[in-house]
Every structure is written in structure tokens, then in C-alpha cells.
């Protein structure tokens, strides 16, 4: 059952070939057997999920309409509000905070009969790339045991990779969906900025953050995007129209940009896997177009300067007065460092020296990457330039940040991007990143569908 295409499973549930309760039961057993070792889920609400599945089954049995996600089991990153669930952001700051409402994406999932099974682990307040900074302990990588699953949505990626749910939601600020998708050998999608409502998300950096799905197959990504995308009056950053996910393009004639600088910063073993996948695409008729990107060295400093300032602003509400603890009193070292850096940069006398220059650099990067995309249909390359390290291995901050060098570009530019499995290096998964013009989310989904069949 776990290998069944997600869209086929929905059809099977709707047509009496499988009940929502049976689907849920297998995932609950899987979670019970595996989660103590993997630590993908921080909270599982089995009883509520069982009631929800029974309601869906009763409606199907009586011939009533059911939604696009009927009976699918979904995990949710712990920084997205779900009513009556623990929304901790994997921090002691909010360890006992219970969501009082559903985020827009959760409401839409429930309206389409998706079943929320629980909250997944993550880096504390999404500030990390390994899911090791969680107050509740690290998450293991089911696809490469003993290594990090990536982050910050590592629990969501691990849950999908371990077969604990059909779909999972993550948030992506600088690669936090795509990075763990790559490391765990699953698919992850960061939508165009504004395509999906952020209402109900605990922000890391509001001008970068996007909620998106992780899944084991392309149909799961497409189904989830179809449900969660669209204008939301509660989030003024959302776009008026949803992306067209019905795009169908064969690889034959598809213009695929390959950026030389992206490959130059990538480990040789990963590069070989990526080149193999690009070669397979070319064999199917894709046109490979070599491109140059002149601002690769600007991307990480630009991203982190803006990230620090926006994160500092976002964390001022965690003062311990209304709920939880004062963040500076209980948070981990990475969160505290980002707060201190954001405070320093935000000081009036320094804003022109760092933050304003970072905004100018962001404009340069956005113009450069969108300019390159005007010549091709998609840009393809490695998602992450190096393999995931061993759990517990000590890395300097800049070594950790290096995981993000190829993923932050999409967040700086607001463009859609995804990671799809490309192969492995010694059994460790490697992801192929696809990027497209703003609003061309459907082009990426179409390309993912074609690449997955190679």
C-alpha cells in the first residue's frame, strides 16, 4: 500500500477499494513501530484521527461527496497552527502552547477531507538545516540512518520517508523543505512566494517563508498544492490567482538551464549523480542550456543578514507575558545567536551599513536569476551541495550554512523550487533541484512528473 501513487489511493478510498480507516491504521502502526527511533513526530493524535477517518468512511458508504484529499494521512510541521495540537516550534519557549485555531492551509486540508495525524519535529523555530536543534531531540534520517535528515522541516521529510504518512507540510525559508527532501529521498516543493497563505505560520523570516508539501510521489505534491494554494484575505501577501498546475510538458523540447556556478560549489560525488540525471533528461529530448550566475558569493550573506533582522523582529512577541517562556531565557544557541545578530544589525546606526545593502543585493540576485529563467523553462541542478553529516557531529555555523547556498536563491527571488530524488551516493539520497519563473509552479510539477518516470 505504501508504494501506491497518492492520487490512486484517493480514488481507491472513494471507490470502496480501501477505507480511510484502513489507510490510517497502517500509518498508526508504522508510527508506533518506528517513531521512537526516528523521532519524526512530536505529537500524534490517533483517537481524533480515527474519528475523522470513520466520518469520511461513513460519508463514502452513504454515497456523499468527499474532498480531494479524502482519507489521506498528513503530518504537519510544528510551526503551523492546528487547533488543539501542540504548536511548539520545537522550542521550550512554546513547549505547552496549544493552537487555538487552524492555519488557512490546515482549514483547507480539513475541508478536502485530509486527516491530520500529528505534529512533526523541526529545528527550533526553523532556525537550522539539520533538525538537531529541536528541544525535543534530533530526528534520524530513515533513508540514511545515523545521518541528519536535513532541516528545518526534517521531521516532515523523515515521516514521509519512513512511511508514517501520505503527505506532510513544511515551511521553507531558505531551503527548509527542499533540503530535507533531498537528504531523505522524497519530494519537496517550495511554492512561488504568495501562492500559499502564511496565515497561522510562526514566522522565521516573513519575506522568505512559504508553506509547502512533502510527498513520496509527484501526484501527492500536486494534490497538496492544489488544495493549499490560492488567495487568502487573512494574508495580504497572497497572490490573487492560484498557480496553473495543469501544465503538461514533455521533456522533449524542454529548455533546461544548468548553472555552472551551482555545480562548481557542489561535491564531486553529488555532481556525478546530477550529471547522470541531466544526461537522462537530455536523452529524452530536453535541451540543456549552460548558464552563468554572477552572484553566487552574495547569496548566503544576503540571505542571512535579512533573515537575522526579520527573525529578531518575529521573536519579540515571545516575551513570556501572554504564554510560554521568554525566548532568550530558554532557547538554544543557534536561535539565541540569530536574535543577537538581528538585534545588532537592527540598531539604527548600523541599518544602512548592513540591512539596506542586503536588500540591494537581494534585488540584484532576483534580477539575475529571473533574467536567466527568461531564457529557459526551468533551471536544474543539485538541491544541496554536500551530503548530510553524521548526527551529533560538530559543525561551525558557516559549515552548517553552506547546506543552504543553492536553495536560498529561490527564497531571495520569490520563485518556485522543488527537490526530486536524483539518485544516491553510497546509499545516501541526492536531490535534483528544479526552479522556474514566479508563478510557473505548474511547469516544475510537470517536469517532476516527467523526471520521476525516467
UniProtKB/Swiss-Prot annotation:
The active site is at 77 (charge relay system), 152 (charge relay system), 176 (acyl-ester intermediate). It catalyses: L-glutamyl-tRNA(Gln) + L-glutamine + ATP + H2O = L-glutaminyl-tRNA(Gln) + L-glutamate + ADP + phosphate + H(+). Allows the formation of correctly charged Gln-tRNA(Gln) through the transamidation of misacylated Glu-tRNA(Gln) in organisms which lack glutaminyl-tRNA synthetase. The reaction takes place in the presence of glutamine and ATP through an activated gamma-phospho-Glu-tRNA(Gln). Pfam families: Amidase. GO terms for molecular function: ATP binding; glutaminyl-tRNA synthase (glutamine-hydrolyzing) activity. The keyword Lipid biosynthesis does not apply. Heterotrimer of A, B and C subunits. Belongs to the amidase family. GatA subfamily. It is an enzyme of class 6 (ligase). GO terms for cellular component: glutamyl-tRNA(Gln) amidotransferase complex. Keywords: ATP-binding, Ligase, Nucleotide-binding, Protein biosynthesis. Signal peptide: none annotated. InterPro entries: Amidase (IPR000120), Amidase_CS (IPR020556), Amidase_dom (IPR023631), AS_sf (IPR036928), GatA (IPR004412). This is Glutamyl-tRNA(Gln) amidotransferase subunit A. It comes from the Archaea. Its EC number is 6.3.5.7. One of its GO terms (biological process) is translation. The gene is gatA.
